[in-house]
Amino acid sequence: ESQRLGPNDRQQVLATLNAAPEINEVIFSGGDPLAVNDRLLAQWAEALAGIPHIKRLRIHSRLPVVIPQRVCDALLGWLGNSPLQKILVVHVNHPAELDSDTRKAFARLREVGVTLLNQSVILKGVNDSANILARLSEDLFDSGVMPYYLHAFDPVAGAHHFDVSDQAAAALVRALMTRLPGFLVPRLVRELPGETSKTPVFTGDNQANISVT
């Protein structure tokens, strides 16, 4: 947001990116970056597109799910005008979240060239079921969204009742492998303090224990 990242900060970020040709993707994450106004987001997208080695802009947001009206003409305008490859990672945890308004929002995003991926969190009593997760993957794909990550639960104060053990999470993924084609099985990962990227959780298959982004 403008209060957190002023013009001088922006110039410093852009200078750093210009001097780092090994960086080809920029991620807008949060908080929720789509809580920022579209004028500022458009300025950032335009500036990033001016850096020759930046190819992709990836945005992580839950707003298109909880407030599908956020996918407005202004947002679609700057996304559609950007020459960058655009990826939006949405956060859908249960098939019930995919209502008609959300599906329409996803369709509008795809129409302007946005690739849609999903990441979910395994939550006890919400989606810790192979049936629910399989239906979620199928419904996401029907909505033009590829399953991407399935997050193992990270301990959060006041949310221990949602905790699902790594063993149970791995068993869920193995069950999904028997029900779904491989491209619909999300990768089981967790975020570890101090790590710069997500770390896969071993499921007993041939999933390598390496860091991924």
Where are these regions (language model features)?
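Canonical Radical SAM [4Fe-4S] cluster-binding loop centered on the CxxxCxxC motif
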Residues: 1-8, 59
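Conserved AdoMet/S-adenosylmethionine-binding subsite of the radical SAM
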Residues: 11-25, 34-180
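Short glycine-rich or small-residue beta-strand-to-loop segments that form or flank ligand, phosphate
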Residues: 27-29
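C-terminal accessory regions of radical SAM enzymes
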Residues: 171-213
